[in-house]
A protein has these predicted regions:
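Conserved acidic segment of CheY-like receiver
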Residues: 3-13
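Acidic, metal-coordinating helix/loop segments flanking the phosphotransfer/catalytic sites
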Residues: 35-50
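C-terminal output helix
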Residues: 108-116
Length: 125
């Protein structure tokens, strides 16, 4: 089996565990990023099928992470699935402007995680 790796930038351990368990059940390998440095190092050293980022994570600067990924030619094609609080319209617009493949509300992310990852990761060869 060709294992697909997904980098997950979520510092909340309970939310991360939910994401990890759901995706590992689908056969994905999960790498966790807890810091900006983690994101840059893991994204550049691993062939990623997708990058998942919590735009509201207070311990990570999600916008900086997106800028870092998109600035590097070897990483700028990685599909990105982002999620944020639904009322933060500016966050949605800014994330899209920075090249996020898909951004959804936290509720939609939680309820449709597997489908969303398949949709986003399926765009990456």
């Amino acid at each position: 089996m060709n294992e697909k790796t997904i980098l997950v930038a979520v510092t909340d351990i309970f939310f991360y565990t939910k994401v990890r368990d759901a995706l590992m059940a689908k056969g994905y390998k999960i790498e966790r990023a807890r810091t900006q440095q983690d994101i840059a190092e893991k994204a550049s050293s691993t062939t990623l099928s997708a990058f998942i980022v919590d735009m509201n994570d207070e311990k990570l600067n999600a916008f900086q992470a997106l800028e870092t990924l998109k600035a590097d030619t070897s990483m700028k094609t990685i599909p990105i699935l982002a999620f944020a609080n639904h009322e933060e319209v500016d966050t949605f617009h800014r994330a899209k402007a920075l090249g996020v493949t898909k951004i959804v509300s936290r509720n939609e992310f939680s309820s449709r995680l597997k489908d969303l990852v398949e949709e986003v990761a399926g765009t990456h060869v």
